[in-house]
Amino acid sequence: MEKVAIVTIESLNYGNRLQNYALQEVLKSMGYVVRTVHRIYEPKTVKIYVKRMVQNVLQTKAAKFRKFDKKIEFSNVVLKRDEYPIGLEDGFNYFIVGSDQVWNPHYDFVAGKCDFLTFARNNQKISYAASFGVNEIPYERKFEFAEYLKNFKAISVREKQGARIVEELVQRNATVVLDPTLLLDENEWKQVEKKTVCCPKK
């Protein structure tokens, strides 16, 4: 069976965890062995550092997210924004980045080398519902983004504006797709809800 690695934002955020889980389940239903790559974020601004301190205080919330994370099958590999282990590309057939704001140029913990899968071979690089989170890429980063994007085997994005950005930068048509959470049906989510204690109460 072919192996697929998901590269996404890993944080204490309901939407992030749910989209990660949904993409995993969809790929598994297609017959792939799926693993999500662990991420480590190094604080680069005081704002992010303080945010993390607050998150660490919220131990109950963190514990609940860890319980939900047991539903996500992680690899033993750890990525930083611009650092990755040598030979990572040999462990998987494909790498899929998305479906969060992994390409947001204003977030200094993403939109780095790992989020553009620079460690992988060109025929391994795929994005699913990736988001830029902006209407336009800052001028000073356009060349960088173009160099990264032109090497992808397939590009799909979450918003129409994202498709326009891709067309502007690399003259390619990016497919606008659904968020993976919308690919699971109602019964599948009800089963998740029954087994999960971290979801907010109604």
Outline where the language-model segments fall.
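A polyampholytic, Gly/Pro-enriched intrinsically disordered region
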Residues: 54-61, 194-202
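Short hydrophobic beta-strand segments
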Residues: 3-7, 199-202
